[in-house]
Swiss-Prot record:
Placement of sequence motif Bipartite nuclear localization signal: 27-43
A single GO molecular function term of this UniProt record: mRNA 3'-UTR binding
Subcellular compartments: Nucleus
Organismal lineage: Eukaryota, Metazoa, Chordata, Craniata, Vertebrata
Protein name as it appears in the record: RNA-binding protein Nova-1
Organism: Mus musculus (Mouse)
Amino acid sequence: MMAAAPIQQNGTHTGVPIDLDPPDSRKRPLEAPPEAGSTKRTNTGEDGQYFLKVLIPSYAAGSIIGKGGQTIVQLQKETGATIKLSKSKDFYPGTTERVCLIQGTIEALNAVHGFIAEKIREMPQNVAKTEPVSILQPQTTVNPDRIKQTLPSSPTTTKSSPSDPMTTSRANQVKIIVPNSTAGLIIGKGGATVKAIMEQSGAWVQLSQKPDGINLQERVVTVSGEPEQNRKAVELIIQKIQEDPQSGSCLNISYANVTGPVANSNPTGSPYANTAEVLPTAAAAAGLLGHANLAGVAAFPAVLSGFTGNDLVAITSALNTLASYGYNLNTLGLGLSQAAATGALAAAAASANPAAAAANLLATYASEASASGSTAGGTAGTFALGSLAAATAATNGYFGAASPLAASAILGTEKSTDGSKDVVEIAVPENLVGAILGKGGKTLVEYQELTGARIQISKKGEFVPGTRNRKVTITGTPAATQAAQYLITQRITYEQGVRAANPQKVG
């Protein structure tokens, strides 16, 4: 067994008995051929101990560790497993996910992973939304389309099955890092083993692509499905880990000092992780955002620490999504210099899913603030994205006196009947409703997913009395409704600007 040492949560010792990184063993045979899957070898390990390395979204790490490390300590006691977690900002290359290494019996590995998967599912869906993946691109020796056609018609592969992994959220995914030799066993001869795993579990199982020429030492297995489907698939994958004598050859949890390419965490695209997608540090992000005054709230990065993780997700997802859509951050009242605004746009563009990336980063800040007991000033609770009009009245005419939205957009704000949520009503000109809906309603759905708010638009022909404006009702937490209102308002003003520059454009 490896020597125990305190875990570091957000860079501070918590006294949790988690192992230190073992020496990084990087020497082992090249990837095993698929035929290895038919050879029943058993890796007995040390006293029946095996290793399972998984990725954990940074926003879910805090709930797994628990206050002062209590949750993870109790989990180790109950399962007999040893759990190691990379430091708070030591992410797997190309992601904002931390690496978790579990050591224990087969039963312990399954139990610990079941607990981790449950914690990830408990997080808000707007946080856990992952970047799209496609099953149409080859990632193993198996043709995924052919597998889809041969899957049995059963309760595990019917409507409840994630038949379209492109829409599968991170909450319904499992990501396991395995050595090449184990990957060969999981694939099997001609893809027979991975096909069998999918048929038996009902989940989709995809491996990061195998590169031509240079061999990666590890590959990432992505499992997509409902909780029970994923559980069965993980059990079958752990069986292959048990069979592989080399399954314990890559026990590092930090990739900071790993030289050479690393496997992509996604099953499609390049075989290699894109390290450019790694998020900036908290200090770098704070410098990027600047110390702006948002509706009278000073020092933006400092104020953020006073919000809960969910509020930060709603606020930051909204802002970062605007950047990813190409909105000019100089018009948003963030107090950014031209250089900083350009940098923010570049940072957003560098990520395949900028909204989720921002949410992860800010959720980490919230975790740090909670651990240190820091709070923002008394104005934090009254932070209002919707009132950014006061800060942006002089920017490119948006929200200025000439804008009809500045005077009459907000119809009212009240509490829901049970008092648990805010209800905000705004008026939107009939000819601009399409800008909010988007093609096939895509934009509206995306805004709801990103903010966590419910957005309803009055039916066609139902106007605010005395106007030709449709009523938009936003329901959710204060932060969610404000973020949704901000997204909608910015979308409308952007559309107005486009139409003003091009009078021939119609709604």
